[in-house]
From Swiss-Prot:
NDH-1 is composed of 14 different subunits. Subunits NuoB, C, D, E, F, and G constitute the peripheral sector of the complex. GO terms for molecular function: 4 iron, 4 sulfur cluster binding; iron ion binding; NADH dehydrogenase (ubiquinone) activity; NADH:ubiquinone reductase (non-electrogenic) activity; quinone binding. Its cofactor is [4Fe-4S] cluster. It is a peripheral membrane protein. It comes from Rhodopseudomonas palustris (strain BisB18). The gene is nuoB2. InterPro entries: NADH_UbQ_OxRdtase-like_20kDa (IPR006137), NADH_UQ_OxRdtase_20Kd_su (IPR006138). It is found in: Cell inner membrane. This is NADH-quinone oxidoreductase subunit B 2. Belongs to the complex I 20 kDa subunit family.
Length: 205
C-alpha cells in the first residue's frame, strides 16, 4: 500500500480513492491474522511457574505488545490455556473440563518441567505431563522458566496460529454440530522425535 498526500478539496478518481483506502485479502488470512494478534489467555497456575508467568505481564516485559495481556476470568472467553506448575491427578479432571469449556479454536501452552513431564515428582499423585490428556501446542522448558521464555513461547504460538487455516465456524452434520480441532504439530512430528537419539546440549537451546 502506498501513501500519498492530498490537499483539501482536491478531486481524485474513484479508482485512486479505492487504491488508497482499501485492502484486499482472503478471508482466511484475515481471520488467521486476527487470531494470531489477539490471543486471549486463561491461566491455570498451580505452583512457582505461575509467578514467572505473571511476571511476564509486568511493565518490564510488557506482554501487552503481543496482544495477550487480558487474562480471562472464564474459560468460555479464552482461546489459549496456559498450564503452569505441578498437575496432580485430582486436578486433571477439572483442568480437562476447563479446556472443554473453551471455544474452538483453542491452544495450550505447557509451562515448566512439572507441567511438561511431571518434573522431579515421579510419584503416583502427579500427572507425568499434561500432554497425556490435553493437546499441547507449545512447551516451555525450565524449573521455573524465565519470563523471556514465556514471551518466546507466545511468539512461537502466534507464528503457528498465523499459519493455520481453521474453519470459521462449526461443521454441521446430519443431526449435530461437530467441532473442529486441527492436527497438532507435536503429533505430526512424533515419529521424527521418537527416532532421535542425540539431543542438543542446553547451550544450543
Amino acid at each position: 500500500m502506498s501513501y500519498t498526500l492530498q490537499r483539501p478539496g482536491e478531486d481524485i478518481s474513484v479508482e485512486e480513492h479505492m487504491a488508497r483506502t482499501s485492502l484486499f485479502a482472503r478471508l482466511e488470512d484475515l481471520v488467521a491474522w486476527s487470531r494470531k494478534n489477539s490471543l486471549w489467555p486463561f491461566n491455570f497456575g498451580l505452583s512457582c511457574c505461575y509467578v514467572e508467568q505473571v511476571t511476564a505481564l509486568t511493565s518490564v516485559y510488557d506482554q501487552a505488545r503481543f496482544g495477550a495481556e487480558v487474562i480471562r476470568a472464564s474459560p468460555r472467553q479464552a482461546d489459549l490455556l496456559v498450564v503452569s506448575g505441578t498437575v496432580f491427578h485430582k486436578m486433571a479432571a477439572p483442568l480437562l473440563r476447563l479446556y472443554e469449556q473453551m471455544r474452538a479454536p483453542r491452544w495450550v501452552i505447557s509451562m515448566g518441567a512439572c507441567a511438561n513431564s511431571g518434573g522431579m515428582y515421579d510419584i503416583y499423585s502427579v500427572v507425568q505431563g499434561v500432554d497425556s490428556f490435553l493437546p499441547v501446542d507449545v512447551y516451555i522448558p525450565g524449573c521455573p522458566p524465565r519470563p523471556e521464555a514465556v514471551l518466546d513461547a507466545l511468539i512461537m504460538l502466534q507464528q503457528q496460529v498465523g499459519s493455520e487455516h481453521r474453519p470459521l465456524g462449526v461443521t454441521v452434520g446430519n443431526s449435530a454440530g461437530l467441532g473442529f480441532d486441527a492436527p497438532r504439530r507435536r503429533d505430526q512430528r512424533r515419529d521424527e522425535r521418537m527416532a532421535q537419539t542425540l539431543l542438543d546440549p542446553p547451550e544450543k537451546l
